From Swiss-Prot:
Belongs to the RNA polymerase alpha chain family. GO terms for cellular component: DNA-directed RNA polymerase complex; mitochondrion; plastid. Its main location: mitochondrion. It catalyses: RNA(n) + a ribonucleoside 5'-triphosphate = RNA(n+1) + diphosphate. This is DNA-directed RNA polymerase subunit alpha, mitochondrial. GO terms for molecular function: DNA-directed RNA polymerase activity; protein dimerization activity.
């Protein structure tokens, strides 16, 4: 007969918390367990925290596009515009599972930045000074930006293949940094865990989501 091993029941204490970072203390934990537990938690946070990103674009009036297509009157090609859009910080409230469509409609000469993006009421651009492209002379542009919610790094081939839309490889992860250190005592340990996001999601929610994910995977009876 195998007897149940005595164990601690840890408690989480929030030490610091602001709009894009959180530091918590988790303890008490068994000796030599904190490092393994922290690494698992770190992997879950990086891989399974969802974020919002631009996955592709469409130039209205042009039916066939590819990554190296030139945009009439625009200094950058499609690939360069998409690369600039990868740095867009998008915050969404009350996601209704409808397609995320943003638009840019401008006439040149003009330097287009993220503040020029027209968004639905439930979407906010946090970095509104991000450079996107330059319109030359009297050219006009009418872009539709396609966004999506996802986790981790996703290749463009996942989103499909349409002649009128160019998709790009996308990193949905809103996590900038995760670190930890262990306080060791005679009979137990404490784990100090730190998370920093890009500002598009609440770090407290990130922590709760990671523990919920972990609970779903290990709460197995047999």
């Amino acid at each position: 007969m195998v007897h149940k091993t005595p164990s601690f029941r840890p408690i989480i204490h929030v030490l610091k918390h602001d709009f894009n970072s959180i530091q918590v203390l988790i303890g008490p934990l068994e000796k030599n367990f904190s490092g393994s537990f922290a690494n698992l938690l770190r992997k879950i946070i990086f891989r399974y925290t969802s974020g919002v990103s631009i996955i592709g674009l469409k130039i209205n009036g042009i039916d066939s596009l590819h990554s190296y297509s030139l945009i009439p009157g625009v200094k950058e090609d499609v690939l360069n515009v998409l690369n600039n859009l990868k740095h867009l910080l998008i915050q969404i409230d009350d996601y209704d599972y409808k397609p995320i469509l943003l638009t840019i409609q401008k006439k040149g000469p003009y330097i287009i930045k993220s503040k020029d993006i027209i968004c639905p009421s439930n979407i906010k651009i946090l970095n509104d000074d991000l450079y996107i492209c330059t319109l030359e002379n009297d050219s006009q542009i009418d872009l539709t930006l396609i966004g999506d919610i996802g986790c981790g790094y996703v290749l463009s081939t996942y989103f499909g293949n349409r002649k009128s839309i160019v998709y790009s490889d996308t990193n949905f992860c809103p996590i900038k940094h995760v670190s930890y250190y262990v306080r060791s005592y005679t009979t137990y340990e404490e784990l100090i865990f730190y998370i920093k996001t890009n500002g598009t999601c609440n770090p407290l929610f990130v922590m709760k989501n990671a523990f919920s994910f972990l609970k779903d995977k290990i709460n197995i009876t047999f």
